[in-house]
Amino acid sequence: MLPTVFIVSDGTGITAETFAHSILSQFDQKFRLVRVPFVDSLDKAYATVEKINEAAVHDGRRAIVFTTLVDSESNDIVKRSNALVLDMFQRFVEPLEQELELKSSHAMGRGHQNADTEEYKTRIEAINFSLAHDDGQSNRNLSEADVILVGVSRSGKTPTSLYLAMQYGVKAANYPLIPEDFERGKLPSALAAYSEKLFGLSIDPQRLSEIRNERRPGSKYAAPENCRYEINEAEAMMRREGIKWLSSTHKSIEEIATTILQEIRLDRQSY
């Protein structure tokens, strides 16, 4: 029986879930994850306790609960459940209150009240930019890009571009390197003026073949020998052009994005 882990939040639960994944990944154990977002009333807190207790009875062991509930009364209710409750909010807020000699607002959703701020607008603009400049579909306003990702098809450019835009407000374009570029031995002409904005993504040829076979099974596009050729040529071109690059094979989107931000020295963040 897999241990049941509850992610309990008065908001979306994204913060709690991200933290929980980081902690749980340290253990060689699979878990059953149950997300309980928007617990913003006492009634919902009591209903959550019922779910947790039912899971404990079913599993024959205490559940594990990661909570970011701001309301202390709701938090106290959840803490009375048959579970190991890891209160992420209080764990950090109380020491900060002591250190800063200030009381926190304890207001629900405080981290999402900036919907009309410049940061939010910047993020929306970045998302629209990344969508418009996905896979080289537009060369307009490339000068506005914070970074232009290059690499062969299916090397992770699109999800990385969108993650950079959504999470950090980074205007990330992406451009595919194709066999015609390798035959010419040059980058696409549209990128020539933006060499300082380029960052490359590569990938293990075998993994690339597997991904491409999901899209076009049995095609030359997905053939292992073609994938090896494209990767070898792309990496040679990036070295020749002095483009910083990394392999996306064993990295998460979060790791790739963080590395890119460090390499291009962009200090932009949306909250």
Curated annotation (Swiss-Prot):
- Single GO MF annotation: protein serine/threonine kinase activity
Q: Which residues form the signal peptide?
A: none
Catalytic activity of the protein: [pyruvate, water dikinase] + ADP = [pyruvate, water dikinase]-phosphate + AMP + H(+); [pyruvate, water dikinase]-phosphate + phosphate + H(+) = [pyruvate, water dikinase] + diphosphate
Keyword terms: Kinase, Nucleotide-binding, Serine/threonine-protein kinase, Transferase
- State the InterPro entries in the record: Kinase-pyrophosphorylase, PSRP
| Entries under Pfam families matching the protein | Kinase-PPPase (PF03618)
The EC number(s) given in the record are 2.7.11.33, 2.7.4.28
Which residues participate in ADP binding?
Answer: 151-158
Which NCBIfam families does the annotation name? Answer: PRK05339.1
Matching entries from HAMAP family are given as: PSRP (MF_01062)
Q: What does this protein do?
A: Bifunctional serine/threonine kinase and phosphorylase involved in the regulation of the phosphoenolpyruvate synthase (PEPS) by catalyzing its phosphorylation/dephosphorylation.
The entry assigns this protein to a family as follows: Belongs to the pyruvate, phosphate/water dikinase regulatory protein family. PSRP subfamily.
Q: What is this protein called?
A: Putative phosphoenolpyruvate synthase regulatory protein
* Species assigned in the record: Burkholderia lata (strain ATCC 17760 / DSM 23089 / LMG 22485 / NCIMB 9086 / R18194 / 383)
Organism phylogeny: Bacteria, Pseudomonadati, Pseudomonadota, Betaproteobacteria, Burkholderiales
